[in-house]
């Protein structure tokens, strides 16, 4: 398992407007992660415990 910013089909991370932790936690759960939250510095969803084969970004939106 790994931690990171999950990406959409265009290789951009998921934006979480309004700092919506519930949105990110659900999104991460749908991707089989343990949990997730909205990282306020970048306004992007960050997941903990993603499967190793799930694409992620290490930094930046795209």
Curated annotation (Swiss-Prot):
Described function: Alpha toxins bind voltage-independently at site-3 of sodium channels (Nav) and inhibit the inactivation of the activated channels, thereby blocking neuronal transmission. Is lethal to mice.
GO molecular function per UniProt: sodium channel inhibitor activity; toxin activity
Chief location bin: secreted
Subcellular location: Secreted
Domain notes: Has the structural arrangement of an alpha-helix connected to antiparallel beta-sheets by disulfide bonds (CS-alpha/beta).
Entry-linked SUPFAM superfamilies: Scorpion toxin-like (SSF57095)
Family under the similarity heading: Belongs to the long (4 C-C) scorpion toxin superfamily. Sodium channel inhibitor family. Alpha subfamily.
GO CC list: extracellular region
Database matches in SMART domains: Knot1 (SM00505)
All copies of domain LCN-type CS-alpha/beta, residue ranges: 2-62
Originating organism: Tityus bahiensis
Protein name: Toxin Tb3
Record keywords, A-Z: Amidation, Disulfide bond, Ion channel impairing toxin, Neurotoxin, Secreted, Toxin, Voltage-gated sodium channel impairing toxin
InterPro entries xref list: LCN-type_CS_alpha_beta_dom, Scorpion_toxin-like, Scorpion_toxin-like_sf, Scorpion_toxinL, Scorpion_toxinL/defensin
Tissue/organ expression: Expressed by the venom gland.
Protein's GO biological process: defense response
CDD domains the UniProt entry points to: neurotoxins_LC_scorpion
Domain of life of the organism encoding this protein: Eukaryota
Keyword Transmembrane included in the entry's annotation: no
Covalent S-S links between cysteines: 12-62, 16-38, 24-45, 28-47
Cysteine amide: residues bearing it: 62
């Amino acid at each position: 398992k790994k931690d990171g910013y999950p990406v959409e089909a265009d290789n951009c991370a998921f934006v979480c407007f309004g700092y919506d932790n519930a949105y990110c936690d659900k999104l991460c759960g749908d991707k089989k992660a343990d949990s997730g939250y909205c990282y306020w510095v970048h306004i992007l969803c960050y997941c903990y415990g993603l499967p190793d084969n799930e694409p992620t970004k290490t930094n930046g939106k795209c």
